[in-house]
Regions:
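Conserved small/polar residues in nucleotide/adenosyl-binding loops
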Residues: 226
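Extended, charge-biased low-complexity segments
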Residues: 59-81
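An amphipathic, hydrophobic-aromatic interaction surface with interspersed Lys/Arg
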Residues: 1-63, 122, 128-216
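Hydrophobic, aromatic-lined core segments that form the binding pocket/scaffold
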Residues: 74-162, 166
Length: 227
């Protein structure tokens, strides 16, 4: 589906059984921690979870995103996933082997519905579109670089854990509502889809960046832009 169509959609169809929901800002606010945690489980790349994988003895450079998702799946399927999948229920799905190629898949034996690596990729891609997430395929050049990356991320997570967690979405809403380029109030923002809101954030940032550059040009402080 072309990205422009998402502005007015409530969901993104994946196949005949699965659709990825596009909730409102208000719905996300009421379930912020669990919602973004599930989005992370569905879109995470091994590099995003390098510390967690290292803690259980897995080298993040040796697995792919599908294998990572399978590690999360039992935890994910026990949660309320309605903001992501609507009435599609993950609980009946169990790991199985595809007899055609020997790959691990997830199967609902009662309905025959399957989730494989390709389908998971489509689901993750839809969520990345909704939230403007980049797919991080980076890998360290060698073992020493890998250890350095893990240790640096471990320190970052430790510092983050020492701070009181605030609602990042709420802070972003307050910032935008008090920006002249944004034309919604608090209640109006709650009714926007999370995709509409994320698009608004991106456009406001672009507009402010453009205005600042133009101001610099005319003030004579950004001569590189006119050379």
């Amino acid at each position: 589906m072309p990205t422009r169509h998402l502005l007015y959609q409530k969901d993104i169809p994946i196949n005949d059984y699965i659709r990825v929901m596009i909730p409102t800002v208000g719905e996300v606010l009421e379930n912020e921690d669990s919602y973004y945690s599930m989005v992370s489980m569905l879109t995470a790349m091994p590099i995003d979870m390098m510390v967690q994988l290292d803690d259980i003895g897995i080298d993040f450079t040796t697995i792919n995103e599908w294998e990572l998702f399978l590690l999360f799946f039992n935890s994910l399927k026990e949660q309320d996933t309605s903001l992501i999948f609507g009435d599609f229920d993950l609980k009946p799905f169990q790991p199985a082997i595809n007899p055609q190629n020997g790959n691990v898949i997830l199967v609902n034996k009662a309905t025959g519905v399957r989730i494989d690596r390709a389908l998971h990729g489509q689901i993750a891609g839809a969520l990345r579109k909704i939230h403007h997430l980049e797919k991080d395929n980076r890998k360290p050049a060698n073992g020493e670089a890998r250890e350095y990356m893990i240790e640096r991320m471990r320190k970052k997570l430790r510092r983050k854990g020492m701070r009181t967690a605030d609602s990042q979405l709420e802070e972003l809403i307050v910032a935008l509502v008090n920006t002249e380029q944004y034309h919604y109030g608090f209640e109006g923002t709650r009714e926007l889809s999370i995709y509409q809101f994320n698009e608004s954030v991106r456009q406001v940032i672009k507009k402010i960046d453009y205005d600042n550059k133009m101001h610099g040009i005319y003030a004579g402080t950004d001569r590189k832009s006119v050379v």
